[in-house]
């Protein structure tokens, strides 16, 4: 369009989507992932300067509890305005409510600055570890529906993520009560209340929705250690 997207440093190396996405998909094919029925969803924001591509793998479905299945999901992010590092992230997709479930393992995210030293091979090597990270996390999450959490702990977690935003705290509390009616006052209800907000809460500017969801997911990812503390203490 000729419209300026951003001003970046002299060492910045723009990696076109037309280059990085096919490379990433070749890495998926060459990995140990079962790609039967794979689904791809592409979203963009900020005038197409930021791109999120999510791959969902139905053949890697795990039941957390009866009639509650999660599927492996891997996302790749790329930007033309220098705002995002190139990254790939491991997550999961909850079939029951269509929530994107973020994974907090430090090895679940690969990041690399846009520069001449961008190492695509290292990124694809991280992709090969994705299945193990996913399996490990699902094993832990199977405890969540069985782990009761107190109202005080729930309030601490929601206050941590909401800060001074009373509307956000109210939204999280409302989500939690909805999930409690299905799963009881458990860690699973807390996690789903958080990911429900990240995935489904309205955004002011629909054109930037992909970026907003990413920022919300980062907040949820930062809070996951608090949930793990509750699980371990149970």
Regions found by a protein language model. Name each.
Residues 1-23, 32-34, 193, 198:
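Feature for intrinsically disordered/low-complexity regulatory segments and propeptides
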Residues 2, 6, 37, 116-119, ...:
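Generic, low-specificity signal for short hydrophobic/alpha-helical stretches with a mild N-terminal bias
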Residues 5, 9, 40, 61:
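Sparse, context-dependent recognition of short Cys/His-centered cofactor- or disulfide-binding micro-motifs
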Residues 5, 43-45, 96, 100:
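Compositionally biased, low-complexity repeat tracts
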Residues 15-26, 48-52, 71:
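Short, well-structured alpha-helical interface segments that form or flank functional binding sites
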Residues 29-57:
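A short acidic/basic microdomain associated with nuclease active sites
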Residues 58-234:
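Intrinsically disordered, low-complexity regions enriched in serine/threonine
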